[in-house]
């Protein structure tokens, strides 16, 4: 299991929610009782401080510990924790100003699997998806689920804007419910933007006025082209800009 987050001036945005999600994942795997959440929080900040970082990218990984090679979890009750903090490097400014391209790929999410909602180091599907999108000349991959509905991107959640309303695939679509996704859903009503979690079809994506993706590292990026076709007017839209500004104000980024 792992969490990935960014710190702003030494403060990790919604670290408590990242750790709560980590705890839920640990419970799913039967190792939650051995998890010291308050100790992990202290360790994250100690790692940031030791590396003398203010704006940082953090990866916290927890395993069930050391054991014999098998399909059974170690029973020692002693978890292994690895924390990596490095300088936060965001995509180039033009990616935010002009948007990026995406392609719908064959690599898929499984909405029936409980693993879809668990943040882990199992990135093989995402690696395949990103490779397929690169082959198509795009920077990001849009992944469908086994029902042919839009799920998420390779390492990010996806939103569409249609007639001024905001939509994002529901958790039941086979997504990892991101902390930034959660923040956007909370911010939208305060901006007068109606937001809904629902099934999103490929046609909805193609007909959208705007599309944006989110995660804790990139924050919010506009998608302006899908499978070689412009999305909306082919440039970042006003709803995306308003949400991005509100998110930066929230994080202090």
How would you describe each model-predicted region?
Residues 141-142, 149-171, 177:
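Glycine- and Gly-Pro-enriched alpha-helical subdomains that act as flexible
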Residues 178-183:
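Feature captures the catalytic cores and cofactor-binding loops of soluble hydro-lyases/lyases
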């Amino acid at each position: 299991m792992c969490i990935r987050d960014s710190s702003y001036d030494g403060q990790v945005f919604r670290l408590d929610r990242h750790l709560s999600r980590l705890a839920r994942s640990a419970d799913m795997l039967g190792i939650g009782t051995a998890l010291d959440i308050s100790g992990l929080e202290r360790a994250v900040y100690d790692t940031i401080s030791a590396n003398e970082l203010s704006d940082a990218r953090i990866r916290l990984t927890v395993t069930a510990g050391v054991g014999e090679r098998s399909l059974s979890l170690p029973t020692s009750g002693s978890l292994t924790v690895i924390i990596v903090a490095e300088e936060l490097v965001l995509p180039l400014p033009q990616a935010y100003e002009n948007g990026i391209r995406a392609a719908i790929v064959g690599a898929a999410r499984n909405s029936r699997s409980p693993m879809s909602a668990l943040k882990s180091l199992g990135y093989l599907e995402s690696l395949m998806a990103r490779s397929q999108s690169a082959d198509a000349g795009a920077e990001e991959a849009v992944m469908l689920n086994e029902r042919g509905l839009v799920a998420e991107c390779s390492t990010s959640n996806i939103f569409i804007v249609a007639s001024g309303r905001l939509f994002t695939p529901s958790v039941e679509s086979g997504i990892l419910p991101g902390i930034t996704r959660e923040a956007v859903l909370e911010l939208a009503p305060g901006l007068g933007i109606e937001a809904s979690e629902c099934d999103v079809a490929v046609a909805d994506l193609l007909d959208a006025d705007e599309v944006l993706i989110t995660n804790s590292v990139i924050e919010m990026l506009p998608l302006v082209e899908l499978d070689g076709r412009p999305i909306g007017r082919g440039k970042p839209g006003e709803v995306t800009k308003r949400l991005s500004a509100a998110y930066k104000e929230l994080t202090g980024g």
